[in-house]
Amino acid sequence: MANQPQQPDTELHNASHLMQYHDLIESIVAALDARDAYTASHSDRVADMVLVLAAALGLDEDETTRIHMAAHLHDIGKIAVPDSVLRKAGPLTRPEWEEMRRHPVTGYEILRKVDDFKEIAILVRHHHERWDGRGYPDGLSGHDIPPGSRVIAVADSIDAMMSSCLLYTSDAADEL
C-alpha cells in the first residue's frame, strides 16, 4: 500500500480556518477603531447586539456566525473616508455626506475579493438599506434587503441612538 498523505481532520481544519478569520477581523476592526473615536468599540457593540437579536429570531448557528462577522466589519468601508469627514464634529455638508454614504460599497468591494467573505460582503453592502427603500447604497426595500443586513441595521441603529444619548448625559443609560 502506497503512503498516502493524511487528510487533516476537516472539523479541526475548519475551526482553525475560522480562528484565522476571527483574528483577521479583530485586526481590521482595531485599525478602523484607531481612526475614529465614535467607531471605537461601535462594531463590537453592534456585533454583540446581533448575537442577541439572532437568538431572539431563532437563527441557526451558521447564519448567526455570518451575520456576527458582518456586524464586526459593517463599517470597514469607512477606512477610505477622509479623516476630515470621519472625525468632523459638526454636521456634514452634502459632499461630505455623499463621501460617508459610500462606505457600504467600499466595504463590499474590500470583502468580496475573499471567497469565504462574499456573503458577508453582501450583508455589509446593504446594512444602511431601509424597509421603505429610502436607504443606501442601492435603495433596496422590503424583502429585497438581505435578512442579515436588516439585523445589522437594527443593531447599528440601537447603538447609534444609545451612543448619541450618552454624549448628552451620563444618566441616559438609566433613562433607557
Stretches with model-predicted labels:
Residues 171-176:
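A short, hydrophobic C-terminal helix/tail in secreted or cell-surface proteins
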Residues 12-13, 19-170:
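Metal-dependent catalytic cores of enzymes that make or break cyclic nucleotides
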